[in-house]
Every structure is written in structure tokens, then in C-alpha cells.
Amino acid sequence: MLFQEFHSAMSAPAIFTSNQVYAWRPGFDKNNFTRWTKKGLLIKLRNGYYTFPEFLHEPNFAFFVANKIYKPSYISLHSALAFYGLIPETIVQLTSVSTRKTNTFENPFGTFSYKTIKPQVFFGYDPLPFSGEKKLLMAKPEKALLDLLYLYPFYKTKNDFLNLRLDESFIEESFNIELLQSLADGFKSATLANRVKNLLKVIV
């Protein structure tokens, strides 16, 4: 099979699975995945997931990768907070939450870390426009902060919250305190509610 034919068929979804390829062409030679990856024509994202190297230079494509290679998941925690400008740090790993087990993947787009949350708190994210009809599933800033407090219990004191260096202008102009409290109620966790109470003493 000519690679050009394959590329034409698979470039629209941008990220595709081996099963999608077999559905498109039942007689597809699986050795093509290895050959084309070695030649630099394909990028392997994780077992069974691939994309093309031209997407390495597309802004925010790593976020799209994060959504696609481990489902269900949405971008949250430090990566979402940095995306909104709520924290200043340069993020080494792209962090997401998922109802599946905690996992980490590495590929040419970066390191992708997934933390487990319960299905009942898998909410508070938006489908953000990305490219064409593609969307990125990203936590609302308020939910990203709640996920952080929920999954990292060492954030609990005034100094802990000050060390996060939350952007004051974003808090004043864009952060929704009422939404934060409403989303926190959905966790049904007295421990989290107490952390939120301490957080509000710092940011309000």
C-alpha cells in the first residue's frame, strides 16, 4: 500500500487507532505501522494509537493527544490551571483526570499523566474549540483547582495555597467563586469542603 493513500484516509481524524485502520482496510498489513514509524512517517502515541509528524508543530495538539489516548479523560490539575494563566509554572507533564486507573504515557508530544477520580465527580469540564470541528475537553478553572485539592491533600493550609501563586488578576476578573462552591458541593466531601474554606480565606 502507498503511504499517500493511507495518509489521505487518516489525516482528517488526526489521531487514529489501529482498529480504525483495520475497519477502513481489513487487509491492512500491520507491519506497515512499524515500518512507517521507523521511517518517521508515523508517530506512535501509545499502543494502538498513531498520528502524523506534521502535527508536532500544531499549537495545543498535545492537549488533543491527551484527550484521545486515554478515555474518558479531561485536562485538569496543573495543566489546566497553567492553560488559563491561574498558575505561572511551566508544566513538565500534561495532567488529566480519568475514571480509569492512574497511568502515564510518553511519546514525542510529551509526558501524559492521568489521575483517577470517581465517576460521580467526573464533571466540570468544557469542550473547547480546537481545530475545525475538533474539541478539547478541559476542566473549568474552578474544577481544575478543586481536582487539585481533591487529589493532592497536602494543599490544605494558608501557606500551601499561597505557594500555588494563584494569579490575583485572574481571580478578580474571571474566577467564579459561586461556581467553585457549587462544584465543590458535588464532591460530597467534608474534607474537601474544609480545604475550599481555607482556600477562600486566601483568595477572597
Residue locations for each model-derived region?
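Short beta-edge/loop segments at beta->alpha junctions of small alpha/beta modules
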Residues: 1-72
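Nucleic-acid-binding surface
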Residues: 20, 53-204
